[in-house]
């Protein structure tokens, strides 16, 4: 597995924060690093496989990656990221207690993926731009300023994620996308879903396509297929059982969609013919 080292990314040995844009981010194999990072998805779509679990990411997704996590990007489509790198929560010169603002693992569950709306994403970009402007400065005031900006970024992300509400359609769409991650195997009636999230059906279709690049049903199918591929690689369940568990009522239809999406059959994936290393 590829290991990325801080010496290749941080501008100096005493720098606590670094900005690493990926515009765009191509498919990238599984790796980990000796530093932490906050991945901010600017726009585009892709699959982020985080510690073996697949997540669909789009503009407004924020991922918190620790130094012992492993992850990869695949199935990317104009995926543009900004990575905010930091050595460790306790490696700041002027800040303490940052770990309390970061996602906390509870009972083995780590909430690594958050979502923010478009207006928050704009504020995030402004903070990141200010950090970038000061990257070449190593004096104490500049170091303190960068660390304060990093603290502001964490506060903004935490507050925005905790207070995601139904005030506007963009926030409601974010909640809908999070709901789909948890209910991908359910029978989805888009009229009922639109009503549940106080969106008109037309608005749901338009905004979801703007956000993900595909229609709602195509997005749902892709989500189901990603979950199915994960189960094919990491479980002993039959192809038919996996199809049903991921929301497909017809295993033949599932196999057709699967091959169309990945250019491999479910059996190929089960046998490791796609070259994936378990």
UniProtKB/Swiss-Prot annotation:
GO cellular component, one term: cytoplasm
Chain ranges of the HTH araC/xylS-type domain: 174-272
PROSITE patterns cross-referenced by the UniProt entry: HTH_ARAC_FAMILY_1, HTH_ARAC_FAMILY_2
Tagged with keyword Cytoplasm: yes
Principal localisation: cytoplasm
GO molecular function: DNA-binding transcription factor activity; sequence-specific DNA binding
Record's subcellular location: Cytoplasm
Keywords, in A-Z order: Activator, Cytoplasm, DNA-binding, Repeat, Rhamnose metabolism, Transcription, Transcription regulation
Keyword Lyase belongs to the record: no
Matches recorded under InterPro entries: AraC-bd (IPR003313), AraC_XylS_family_regulators (IPR050204), Homeodomain-like_sf (IPR009057), HTH-like (IPR037923), HTH_AraC (IPR018060), HTH_AraC-typ_CS (IPR018062), RhaR_RhaS-like_N (IPR047220), RmlC-like_jellyroll (IPR014710)
Site note Interaction with sigma-70, residues: 241, 250
Residues annotated to bind DNA: 191-212, 239-262
One of the GO BP terms on file: positive regulation of DNA-templated transcription
Assembly and binders: Binds DNA as a dimer.
NCBIfam families: PRK13503.1
Role played: Activates expression of the rhaBAD and rhaT operons.
Descriptive protein name: HTH-type transcriptional activator RhaS
UniProt source species: Escherichia coli O139:H28 (strain E24377A / ETEC)
